[in-house]
Curated annotation (Swiss-Prot):
Keywords assigned by UniProt, alphabetized: Membrane, NAD, NADP, Plastoquinone, Quinone, Thylakoid, Translocase, Transmembrane, Transmembrane helix, Transport
Any one GO biological process: ATP synthesis coupled electron transport
Subunit structure: NDH-1 can be composed of about 15 different subunits; different subcomplexes with different compositions have been identified which probably have different functions.
Topology class, membrane: Multi-pass membrane protein
Pfam family, one: Proton_antipo_M
Gene: ndhB
Transmembrane regions listed in the UniProt entry: 14-34, 42-62, 79-99, 108-128, 132-152, 167-187, 206-226, 240-260, 276-296, 302-322, 330-350, 374-394, 409-429
Protein name (Swiss-Prot/TrEMBL): NAD(P)H-quinone oxidoreductase subunit 2
Organism domain of life: Bacteria
Amino acid sequence: MPNEIFTINLNAQAIIPEAFILLGIVGTLLVDLAGEKTASKWAPSICYLSIGSSLLSLTLQWNNPVESAFLGSFNSDNLAIAFRAIIALSTLVSLLISWRYTEQSGSPIGEFAAIVLSATLGAMLLCGSTDLISVFISLETLSVASYLLSGYLKRDPRSSEAALKYLLVGSAAAAVYLYGSSFLYGLSGSTNLTTIGLEIINKPSFITSLALVFVLSTVAFKIAAVPFHQWTPDVYEGSPTPVVAFLSVGSKTAGFAFAIRILSTTFSSFDEEWKLLFTILAILSMALGNVVALAQTSMKRMLAYSSIGQAGFVMIGIVSGTQDGLSAAVLYLAAYLFMNLGAFSCVILFSLRTGSDRILDYSGLYQKDPLITLGLSLCLLSLGGLPPMLGFFGKIYLFFAGWANHQYLLVIVGLVTSVISIYYYISVIKMMVVKEPQEASEIVKSYPEVNWGIAGLPPLRVALYTCVAVTALGGILSNPLFKLANTAVSETPFLQDVIAAANNIS
């Protein structure tokens, strides 16, 4: 037995990107112990080095995947690499836009960075987890760090309320996942997702269907799909804005990665059932998310409901289940990273200078801060799907893939709700560019002079310029990005097996 233990090949190189993130966590905690002044100086550099090294190692793994690691509990295939890269990039941008906000709020920077990196670690591990136990550990690592981040402004009652709500709903979602997992283990005698899928093929039963519903409920909570979205607006409104920016992209991306993996492996024999449930979730998310966003007066609440609608669009690609559909879903999540975090960069800048989050307070902003106005306008137009922005091409790929797979209802609902979303996005833009000075809000009239030299603002500026540039140059970037997304799907064996099986049935 001891000899067998030493001959086990764990293929630990699969998690080298996560190892760099872990080193970053240790580094930020150590500088935090040295005092706030030392942490403020060194924590950002440690984070950049950690995330940069992680992204570099992911690049080196691309097309050289480690298919099975840690006795089959983790796969570093191309799909996992793509999702982990999106999460790492979202963390990098979220940190760039958070330094000034964290410093101004009087919160410890080293501690904040360590928790953000911990959430990133959990999210990245979730993307490649192929075992019920590793999924749960990754899920809880992400969730616990997210609860801490939501309540990070300890002296703000809204932040504490957001953390408590998130904790209660998240704990319920974790319990539901464990209950569903216990059914799957009882039916198959295994915790490996692929093995479970093979064992339950010939065991269609009420218990299996119940397990599917429970697991799908956890997925829906993670991606904030209706009707599991109730936590989203309150948590987004009460949490620190940089935290909201990270959760809206990083957490959602991890949720979709988990959804694709478990639905395509464990529940591949229940293809019609989960696609029907996902279709219902997508329609409800697109409709409710975009309609309720019309009535919002808070910018963060509006973006919260917008993110619910955006999740519905991504689900179109997953429901189609084709090569183009899954590639379009990956592409849209990459596009969503830049256009959503670009919008949040502008919201954070406005909040830092005015302390306000009300949409009405943006009236006349063009006269005092043309940069925020231009950046926010471009990102909102991209979220609405207007050409020639990156979001337009992302939606086009999704709608074409859905239509080709005969998902006509989903595509029609997607088109209608996209038009609805354009209305509330353009309403914000119209408000910012009012012509008459007297129409400007009182907040804008007393708007401070723009000074980019303040500590913490140069990184935010870099993030803003980068996100807006990528969003605006969508026409040039969409094709190479789609090719990368297509490679992520075509070079992932379990997805090719599922796509081939679906083609044979059709």
